Amino acid sequence: LEEKYIKHRYAPILPSKNEWPVVKLARERKEFVKKISDLSEKRILDLTGNNHDILKEELETTLYREKLRIKQNPWAVDPDDENEFWGEVKHSLLQVNAESGLTKANRLKQYKSVLHRITSRYAEEIASNFKHTHYKFTRSVVQFGFSRLLNAARVKGFRSIFSTQFSLQDKIQITGETDQLRDLATKGTIVMVPTHFSNLDSILIGWIISVMGLPPFIYGAGLNLFNISIFAYFMNALGAYKVDRRKKNLMYLETLKTYSKESIQYGCHSLFFPGGTRSRSGMIESKVKLGLLSTAIEAQRANYQTGTQDISAKIFVV
């Protein structure tokens, strides 16, 4: 016989919202964004060996790709000042290149200034806008909305939409090592890596996280989802930071990875879809993308090197 599913009520691990890492991070958003920009800039300078010629090449490559993206693949969610910003970057680079009397040190300084403007913009674009009041509202809407839809599917007739015969947890059964997951959340930072099935995954997994009494997770959501206003609201409310998969330049990718790494080090539980895109077959991915996932390893290594001893020191990938 099939074992009967028992609905559990889980007490919140952190009862006060003020204890949630995502709330603490949201309060320090301005300072955190600046930190991400500065660390990304330093990382890029290290990768280019502080060589002004290599840095110039990366800046020009970024400019070219961004101008091409704006022309060939614009999205509604893109900032209104995109053309203006990249036009200013182009003007600055032309100005530096035209000044033949500059020393190598001064030329590098000028390029660093342009780099700083780019990483600052990227960091601000990527950063989440978590608000606790919006999170509570979104949780209620998800629970109410999906419950009504599931009742309509299981109970015949139009009036079934308003039925409360079945709750969301009646249909979506939360099974597995739930107690172990809750225990890990009290001992360190969790990085969750589920298989991606649909655009509703983030919302439904967010609801499951809430039901299990875990504090909200942050996660990278494709910027294309923010083209739809209602999705944008829910994504922001659930702690999503933005991932623009059109941008493949070094400066954007390093800023994105730095944001993920520093968020995990801050103690924010995180969620990645390791396949990078939806699994049409429903099978667990045999090949995973290691870009953002590698930031969990980087964060753990950094914690070890700095001797961090608090709860954020240990990172668990589940």
Q: Which stretches of residues belong to each language-model region?
A:
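Membrane-interfacial terminal anchoring regions of lipid-handling membrane enzymes
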Residues: 1-318
